[in-house]
Regions:
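Outer membrane beta-barrel transmembrane domains
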Residues: 258, 273-276, 305-327, 343, ...
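Outer-membrane beta-barrel "beta-signal"
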Residues: 452-464
């Protein structure tokens, strides 16, 4: 490796670890939501409390092990649902970045969901436990050098531990719920279903929120923190979510894995989101079919989010007359939209698009804004209704203070002010519980100072 390459790798080591903590779980839409199978009941997937009362999951069609001879159905009827998913990625940097090379990354996800009313008569009560285990290497940290990351399974270190553990109480006829416990914000905030097929982390939790500020960062994959979350669904077309979450200290990002953050002095994050579904409000002709009974559910969502941390954070490079860092509020906002654009008549096959934009104060962390857009087609071919194909792009821009800090640490000017990633992928459902997903990414200006990189690989996912 050249001298410049070694310097770049040393410089971006800490920075990359910060952004890697923004990886999300398909096992991790943020590593947690994509682990679920198509018909799995998941009260943590962002729906209202009433959504958790849907039909019994069809394990024969969505898992390798099926119904366990009827045992899974009996457990479900008693109020217990268990799911185990293993995902394995192999990605390789073929050109550009830090250096050529690849890495395997594995992720095991065990989810246990409990219905309080069925188990102990706790009306409106539920519990959720998720354990995760990471194995393998780090293709972005060691080979690509992207600020945003390239794979939503990659974590700074390999560990096994608790990721989610919360209790929930629903009330107001299931139109509201209060959730308390270990809670990652990427399970419900900044979520677009049509982007969940992609492997790039920024199509889960966006880069400007996932990046750590000068003092602390968010509770997201792979490190969670304790929180209290209130959700209100006054109407099927509207929802509002508000959460107060303990921050993850920035001084431990290099060692943070899938474990719990209890450290004091890291501040707290307040985040809120309001969303609206034009389709559920009856504003769109979302069911172009002659059948009276149509189970097709179009993707349709508009949302606005706001977040801020307390206390105030030190600015990255700005100082006062005495040479002490200036303090500023670490905050941001985002808007998102996704919508089914076209549906194959008389089917569940559809083309959807998403668009997301978010910005920050630009003083207390590297990025000041990012945006992403893409298309995904569920059931692109006749007879392949469970497959999904997609193409998407995301761009993250570094603010003036972020660029100044990176340039000073590197000892030379940066080659760009922004990093852009484009991804194409095809997720093929080969059998019940078995999916294979090839992917190609092109990373422009990785790390704002490295040659453009091309990344290719494949994901294997097994729902057991």
């Amino acid at each position: 490796m050249s001298v410049q390459g070694k310097r770049l790798r040393a410089l971006y080591g800490a920075t990359l670890l910060s952004f890697l903590l923004g990886s999300s779980l398909a096992v991790p839409v943020a590593a947690a939501e994509e682990v679920t199978t198509d018909e799995e009941v998941n009260t943590d997937a962002g729906g209202s409390a009433a959504d958790a009362t849907d039909a019994t999951p069809n394990w024969q069609e969505t898992t390798l092990s099926g119904d366990w001879g009827g045992s899974r159905k009996r457990l479900y009827d008693a109020g217990v649902q268990a799911d185990l998913v293993y995902s394995a990625d192999y990605l390789r940097d073929t050109t550009g970045g830090l250096k050529r090379g690849g890495a395997y990354m594995g992720h095991l996800d065990l989810i246990l969901q409990l219905d309080g009313e069925k188990l102990v008569g706790w009306r409106g009560g539920s519990a959720y436990l998720q354990l995760i285990s990471n194995t393998g290497g780090r293709v972005n940290l060691n080979h690509v050098g992207s600020l945003m990351g390239v794979d939503n399974l990659e974590a700074p270190v390999n560990r096994t531990g608790i990721f989610k553990a919360w209790l929930q109480q629903s009330f107001l006829d299931d139109k509201a719920s209060l959730r308390v416990g270990l809670y990652p914000i990427d399970s419900e905030f900044y979520v677009t279903d049509s982007s969940s097929v992609f492997l790039h982390p920024s199509f889960g939790m966006a880069a400007e929120v996932a990046s750590f500020g000068s003092l602390a960062g968010p509770s997201i994959y792979p490190t969670s923190s304790y929180a209290a979350r209130l959700r209100i669904d006054p109407d099927p077309a509207w929802y509002a979510i508000l959460a107060v979450v303990r921050g993850i200290p920035s001084d431990r990002i290099a060692t943070a894995g899938p474990n719990v953050s209890w450290q004091k002095g890291s501040g707290s994050m307040l985040i809120g989101e309001v969303g609206f579904s034009p389709a559920k409000a009856g504003l769109l002709d979302d069911r172009p079919t002659s059948e009276e009974k149509d189970e097709f559910e179009p993707i349709s969502k508009l949302a606005l989010g706001l977040w801020r941390y307390s206390p105030r954070f030190p600015e990255l490079v700005a100082v006062d007359a005495g040479g002490e860092p200036l303090l500023a509020t670490h905050w941001g906002a985002y808007v998102l939209a996704e919508q089914t654009l076209w549906r194959v008549p008389e089917s569940n096959r559809d083309l959807a698009a998403f668009l997301r934009y978010g910005f920050t104060d630009g003083k207390t962390n590297t990025l000041d804004y990012s945006f992403s857009a893409g298309l995904s087609f569920r059931g692109p071919f006749a007879g392949r209704e469970k497959d999904t194909i997609g193409i998407a792009a995301t761009r993250a821009h570094a603010g003036s203070q972020g660029r100044a800090q990176l340039s000073a640490e590197l000892g030379q000017p940066l080659s760009s002010t922004a990093e852009t990633a484009v991804e194409m992928t095809y997720r093929a459902q080969l059998a019940p519980g078995v999916a294979l997903q090839p992917v190609v990414q092109r990373i422009f200006n990785p790390g704002l100072a490295l040659p453009n990189a091309t990344v290719a690989g494949v994901r294997l996912q097994l729902a057991l």
